[in-house]
């Protein structure tokens, strides 16, 4: 069995990208070519992506939009609090993490951004229900702060408000960006269209749990966070058409991957074909998982000991990912949300846990 230490690596801190590059497509792209063994590592720039994809392939994007989900405020007693909205659950309600010297009880009033009051409702572990005095999304957009990842050391600014969103973000609800999509700009999307590459979207609202490291040595004991996704019928139809013409389904980001594979696994378990789905998923993809939909994956470089590093290791092979990450560190690639990208191809047979 694989253990947590199998997914650890030492990253020089200066390789953690703190800001976005001036141009989205200026990022580097490490292509992991599995047509040979061992896999060949090809250093590219992201603008070269169209040369790596064939006409008739399908790119699947996550169109979630990052909320300005972080608030600073205070209790009626004057005690300082920090609130991170995890999920909007209704027009006037949301689930949130609350940092405070003492957890607020139900019925407590909290003042946020020195602008409005929310009331604490029932606890839904590990979150608190918050009741807003006006539509949540309006207040979040007007008064909230962009929740940059914990490893980005500057406060969010106007540049982040543009660059920590994809150009196609349209469904508000995430508290972290689907970062593989940050490399695409409109000219690149139009270039892909002109080449005959198909595009489709789904929605998965990325939760703060995406940054949580695994803390148990036996990774099978890890409790995965849950996220909501919407896989529309139009995407199901495009996947079927792509399969019929022999094209590849290419997930743009691990969030697109998780939604696609969650829906496909549920369909398999129910003995039916892939169908339009709106559901929660806590799918935890580790080596040994049998991929059902995704053939290739565009993804950024992930944190040590993270569930996403385990996912890409399951997809491309543990040793392949180790070699790719060693190469990326030697070649000074930029890591994490504002960093560079990889293009991976699925390992043909699932890797047995511990193999």
UniProtKB/Swiss-Prot annotation:
A GO-annotated cellular component: cytoplasm
Name of the protein: S-adenosylmethionine:tRNA ribosyltransferase-isomerase
Known function: Transfers and isomerizes the ribose moiety from AdoMet to the 7-aminomethyl group of 7-deazaguanine (preQ1-tRNA) to give epoxyqueuosine (oQ-tRNA).
Record Gene3D superfamilies: QueA-like
Top-level taxon of origin: Bacteria
Pathway: tRNA modification; tRNA-queuosine biosynthesis
One GO BP annotation of this record: queuosine biosynthetic process
Cross-referenced InterPro entries: QueA (IPR003699), QueA_dom1 (IPR042118), QueA_dom2 (IPR042119), QueA_sf (IPR036100)
A GO molecular-function annotation: S-adenosylmethionine:tRNA ribosyltransferase-isomerase activity
Location of the protein in the cell: Cytoplasm
Its EC number(s): 2.4.99.17
Main localization (coarse): cytoplasm
Keywords for the protein's UniProt record, in alphabetical order: Cytoplasm, Queuosine biosynthesis, S-adenosyl-L-methionine, Transferase
Reaction equation(s) it catalyzes: 7-aminomethyl-7-carbaguanosine(34) in tRNA + S-adenosyl-L-methionine = epoxyqueuosine(34) in tRNA + adenine + L-methionine + 2 H(+)
Similarity comment text for this entry: Belongs to the QueA family.
Subunit-level organization: Monomer.
């Amino acid at each position: 069995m694989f253990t947590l230490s199998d997914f650890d690596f030492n990253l020089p801190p200066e390789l953690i990208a703190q800001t976005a590059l001036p141009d989205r497509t200026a990022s580097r792209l490490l292509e992991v070519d599995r047509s040979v063994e061992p896999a060949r590592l090809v250093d590219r720039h992201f603008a070269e992506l169209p040369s790596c994809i064939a006409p008739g392939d399908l790119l699947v994007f996550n169109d979630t939009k990052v909320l300005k989900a972080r608030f600073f405020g205070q209790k009626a007693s004057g005690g300082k609090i920090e609130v991170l909205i995890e999920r909007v659950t209704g027009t006037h309600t949301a689930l949130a993490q609350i940092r405070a010297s003492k957890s607020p009880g139900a019925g407590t009033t909290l003042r946020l951004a020195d602008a409005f009051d929310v009331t604490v409702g029932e606890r839904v572990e590990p979150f608190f229900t918050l009741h807003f005095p006006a539509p949540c999304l309006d207040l979040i957009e007007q008064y909230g702060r962009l929740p940059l990842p914990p490893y980005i050391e500057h406060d969010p600014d106007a540049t982040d408000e543009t660059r920590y969103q994809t150009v196609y973000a349209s469904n508000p609800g995430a508290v972290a960006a689907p970062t593989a999509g940050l490399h695409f700009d409109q000219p690149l999307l139009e270039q892909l269209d002109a080449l005959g590459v198909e595009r489709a979207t789904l929605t998965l609202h990325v939760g703060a749990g995406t940054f949580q490291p695994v803390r148990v040595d036996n990774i099978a004991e890890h409790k995965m966070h849950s996220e909501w996704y919407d896989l529309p019928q139009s995407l199901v139809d495009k996947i079927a058409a792509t399969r019929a013409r022999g094209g590849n389904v290419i997930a743009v980001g691990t969030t697109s991957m998780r939604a696609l594979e969650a829906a496909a696994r549920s369909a398999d378990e129910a003995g039916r074909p892939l169908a339009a789905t709106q559901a929660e998923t806590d799918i935890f993809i580790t080596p040994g998982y049998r991929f059902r939909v995704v053939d290739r994956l565009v993804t950024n470089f992930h944190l040590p000991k993270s569930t996403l590093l385990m996912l890409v290791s399951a997809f491309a092979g543990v040793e392949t990912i180790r070699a790719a990450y060693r190469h990326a560190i030697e070649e000074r690639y930029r890591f994490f949300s504002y960093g560079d990208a990889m293009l991976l191809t699925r390992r043909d047979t699932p890797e047995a846990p511990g193999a």
